[in-house]
């Protein structure tokens, strides 16, 4: 799992290049991969797709609707609101399958091969993380398209249960329990550790 961060997939720092080399090896080996936000953008760029800011300067900071595509319906059974915090999006890499789309940044979730996924949104973010981000990066809340701190916290109250349910279902699909093991030992349980609070 490669999470998000304030850097860009287009940055030329050595650690960004190293991360992309790692992603390339993981994809070639068909190792299960999940890229969240920056992690999805790095996967897309590794595969030759463009990562760029919105043409009109819009950001997605807050809750935005995702719409499933026909191939995405098993993982995205219905439209849903998802938490976002990004200024760049990714073009769909050649050979990737678009699973969910959005109105501002069209490519919101994709699959490459059998078990590599990139998602632009942040299902892992807790309320504590949301509050911290909205405080430390308050300057971004005035960017075009960004939602206020209050709107984000209200969105959390309205949409978070469904987003957590989606995350549990997705992780159990992506990393199913071992034979005979209860679902609590699955990938969903792995992201429920205190480190994510």
Regions found by a protein language model. Name each.
Residues 15, 61-65, 82-85, 133, ...:
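Tryptophan-centered motif/residue detector
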Residues 16-20, 51-52, 100-101, 135-137:
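Glycine-rich, phosphate-binding/catalytic loops in enzymes
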Residues 14, 38, 46, 94-95, ...:
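Generic recognition of short, well-ordered alpha-helical segments
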Residues 126-197:
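Acyltransferase
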Residues 3, 37, 120:
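Short beta-strand segments
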Residues 47-128:
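Pocket-forming structural segment of enzyme catalytic cores
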Residues 1-34:
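Flexible gly/pro-rich beta->alpha loop and the following alpha-helix that scaffold active-site loops
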Residues 26-50:
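Catalytic nucleophile loop
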């Amino acid at each position: 799992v490669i999470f998000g961060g304030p850097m860009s997939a287009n940055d030329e720092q050595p650690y960004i290049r190293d991360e992309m080399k790692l992603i390339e090896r993981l994809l070639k080996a068909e190792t299960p991969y999940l890229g969240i936000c920056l992690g999805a953008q790095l996967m897309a760029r590794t595969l030759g797709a463009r990562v760029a800011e919105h043409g009109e300067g819009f950001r997605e900071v807050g809750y935005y609707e995702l719409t499933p595509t026909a191939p995405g319906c098993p993982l995205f059974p219905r439209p849903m609101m998802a938490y976002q915090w990004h200024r760049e999006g990714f073009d769909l890499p050649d050979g990737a399958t678009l699973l969910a789309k959005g109105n501002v940044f069209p490519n919101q979730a994709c699959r490459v091969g059998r078990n590599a996924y990139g998602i632009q949104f942040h299902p892992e973010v807790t309320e504590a993380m949301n509050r911290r981000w909205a405080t430390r990066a308050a300057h971004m809340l005035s960017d075009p398209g960004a939602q206020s701190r209050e709107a984000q916290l209200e969105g959390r109250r309205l949409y978070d249960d469904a987003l957590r349910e989606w995350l549990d279902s997705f992780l159990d699909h992506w990393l199913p329990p071992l034979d005979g093991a209860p679902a609590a030992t699955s990938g969903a349980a792995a992201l429920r550790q205190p480190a994510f609070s």
